[in-house]
Design a protein with these regions (language model features):
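Residues immediately within or flanking Cys/His clusters that coordinate Zn2+
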Residues: 48-51, 71, 89
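Contiguous alpha-helical segments
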Residues: 1-61, 66, 84, 94-98, ...
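Repeat-unit-sized solenoid/scaffold elements
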Residues: 74, 91, 120-122
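Short linker/helix segments within small regulatory modules
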Residues: 67-87
Length: 123
C-alpha cells in the first residue's frame, strides 16, 4: 500500500486504529503489571460503543490520537484480573480518569452533596 493509500485507510478506519493502539498499549501495561492479557484488536473493535456507557456522551475516535475527555479509554473493571474479555469495557477518558482517581465511596459522597445543593440544600 502506498503512503497515500495508507493515510486514506487510517482516516477511514479510526475505530480500527484506536482498537489496535489500545491493544498494543494494554499488552505493554499487562506485562509491566504482571496481569493477564487475552484480548485482540478484533475483540476490542467489536465492543467499541458510540457513546460512553457512563455519561451517555458520544465518544470521539481519532485513530491513535487522544481527543480529550471524549476520547475512548480501555478500562479494566477489576484491575487485578487484567485484560481479559469479561473484564474490559470501553468508556470515555473522562469517566476512566474519575474512576481511577477516586474510590466509589468518595464519588458517592460528592454526588450526594451536589444533589443536596441542586435540591436547594446548604453547602
Amino acid at each position: 500500500m502506498s503512503r497515500e493509500a495508507t493515510k486514506l485507510w487510517k482516516e477511514r478506519n479510526p475505530r480500527r486504529i484506536w482498537a489496535h493502539t489500545a491493544c498494543k498499549s494494554a499488552r505493554h501495561r499487562a506485562k509491566k503489571k504482571g496481569v493477564p492479557f487475552e484480548i485482540t484488536t478484533d475483540y476490542v473493535e467489536s465492543i467499541l460503543p458510540d457513546e460512553c456507557p457512563i455519561f451517555n456522551t458520544p465518544l470521539k475516535y481519532y485513530g491513535n490520537k487522544v481527543a480529550g475527555e471524549l476520547s475512548p479509554s480501555l478500562d479494566r473493571i477489576d484491575p487485578a484480573k487484567g485484560y481479559v474479555k469479561d473484564n474490559i469495557v470501553v468508556i470515555s477518558n473522562k469517566a476512566n480518569t474519575i474512576k481511577s482517581a477516586y474510590k466509589s465511596r468518595d464519588i458517592f459522597i460528592v454526588a450526594q452533596w451536589l444533589k443536596g445543593i441542586e435540591d436547594g440544600g446548604q453547602s
